[in-house]
Amino acid sequence: MTRKLFGTDGVRGTANTHPMTAEMALRLGAAAGRYFRPVGAGSPRVVIGKDTRLSGYMLENALTAGLTSTGMNVLLLGPVPTPAVGFLTRSMRAALGVMISASHNPHEDNGIKFFGPDGFKLSDEAEAEIEAILAGEIQPAQPGNIGRAKRIEDGRGRYQEYCKTTFPSGLRLDGLKVVIDCANGAAYRAAPEVLWELGAEVIPVGVEPNGKNINLRCGSTHPEAAAEAVRAHGADVGICLDGDADRVIILDETGKEADGDQIMALFAARWADEGRLRDGTLVATVMSNLGLERFLGARGLRLERTPVGDRYVVEAMRRGGWNLGGEQSGHIVMTDFATTGDGLLAGLQFLAAMAQTGRRASDLARSFETVPQLLQNVRYAAGQEPLKAPGVQAVIRDAEVRLNGAGRLLIRKSGTEPLIRVMAECEDEALLRDVVEEIVAAVRDAA
């Protein structure tokens, strides 16, 4: 059974355009409700969270209508981080969790992703079954079994209190000046409050959402404003989240960025020293830098690579029993604490390292020298398959021959946008540029 509607991170699209319409959200809610509440079953609960996009109101109401039509009782959380939905699904014994968000995308986009009762994102197989239900006639509940919906006020507070329990007991952030950039997104209240309650002096950025400014010149994909705040306020560190707070980028005291690879390297080394890194293994995607792999190997640790997407990182971690993984983009998954990437929890672990060692952020955020890496994205028209073009395939084969033994090449379609991502790594930067530019030109000609 294959998926057509679901991508690597749920269903995404432009708001009010298929599939992100009220009509589709209603049917998707009904299909998910029927999947999680077989005909004749009781009235299980669903938790629904969202980020701060204007279209979230529309999709929230449509999903609620679809879910209640199949007998599910809906608890509306309001704006909360994606990892909060995973946490609350499990802690509140819900049968299903739903997050309405397009993560780091602009406000015009939105998305819907589902969490199972264990708090983990659904498998490809479960999503395919929901699509199959969606394609048919969805049987509604009997009139007396229609579900109820209510808004709950303490969901965010429950998550915030849990976040604080993951911080080392007895450790405080007193005297530490922290810039926190919430991307005008889902964590705009939770993240500053948690940091302040742990003792930090907090300088908030991106905490004035208006429905249209999520990820706009702020957050993990646009950390310039946070970097300027770090320098202007003489802050010790900056933490940049994306719109749904499931990814993080760290800024040192000079405003310089550390991506997910550097964060994972620090955590892996520290956890290995403390005997906490299970089986000496870190799980990361094919996009992670070759320098990370070399750093781990020099310490007798292993890198397990997966396809791109934090869900595939989590699936590999669960299969192998490993407890640390993530993506270069800033998804950091720590299954000792959470069921999905959690930018705030990862930020807290970085701050704990600073507080425990007394070292500066710049010392901790540079664990290894990166191998030169070049990534370019090429947009293509709907219905096109540029990677199947003979000319593109010939250029790719030539690039593989030229890089053989000297570097690494990765070309893939984005799972969330109509983009071809062309990435290469090589110590020879001239060769690196030539290879990527030739492939990009060929893909553009075919797109």
Curated annotation (Swiss-Prot):
Q: What Gene Ontology molecular function terms does this protein carry?
A: magnesium ion binding; phosphoglucosamine mutase activity; phosphomannomutase activity
Any one of the GO CC terms: cytosol
Spell out the Pfam families in the cross-references.
PGM_PMM_I, PGM_PMM_II, PGM_PMM_III, PGM_PMM_IV
Under InterPro entries, the record lists:
A-D-PHexomutase_a/b/a-I, A-D-PHexomutase_a/b/a-I/II/III, A-D-PHexomutase_a/b/a-II, A-D-PHexomutase_a/b/a-III, A-D-PHexomutase_C, A-D-PHexomutase_C_sf, A-D-PHexomutase_CS, Alpha-D-phosphohexomutase_SF
Work out whether the entry's keyword set contains Magnesium: yes
* Gene3D superfamilies listed in its UniProt record: Alpha-D-Glucose-1,6-Bisphosphate, subunit A, domain 3, Alpha-D-phosphohexomutase, C-terminal domain
Top-level enzyme category? isomerase
Listed EC numbers: 5.4.2.10
Q: Which family does it belong to?
A: Belongs to the phosphohexose mutase family.
Q: In its UniProt entry, what is this protein called? A: Phosphoglucosamine mutase
